Amino acid sequence: MMNIQVVMMKQDDPRKCSAAKLVKFGLAKPVKKTTSRTLVLDPFSKKTLLKSDKKLVSSVTGIDCSWNLATTAFKKTFSGIPRKLPPLLAGNPVNYSKLNKLTTVEALAAAVYILGDSDMATTLLDKFKWGHTFFALNKNILQDYSKAESESDIVEICQEYRLPS
């Protein structure tokens, strides 16, 4: 099972923070610094997450920050292996069906799903009333992404679903 970590930037309402809820339920560990063997979810990374990345890392780390402040938050350099997620639709009530406007829990769940742990992805999302909505919107494409072996496979999948790559 993949270790789940979060760097809490504390930029959002703590009552609505999906990462804080994961920490509260013991599903994620809060960290102040990332390590070299963690996969850092970075929406500005040049490389897209692939299932083969699993052999490079021992954990997945989400950077919990406000989307409004994301460009500033990610100017900070984090140790680890940065990867962006392929295009996905948000299932959360704030950004419902917006492309790539995921909460931290949605991003972490998508990452562990693509890395081959769909049970962990379900466990993470089950703590949220709207968690099932994320899977309803993305189930088929997540299955396809989890089989992709290269960036060009991701591009083909995006074309198939008419999403920007």
Across the structure, where does each feature detected by a protein language model lie?
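Long, charged alpha-helical interface segments
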Residues: 139-165
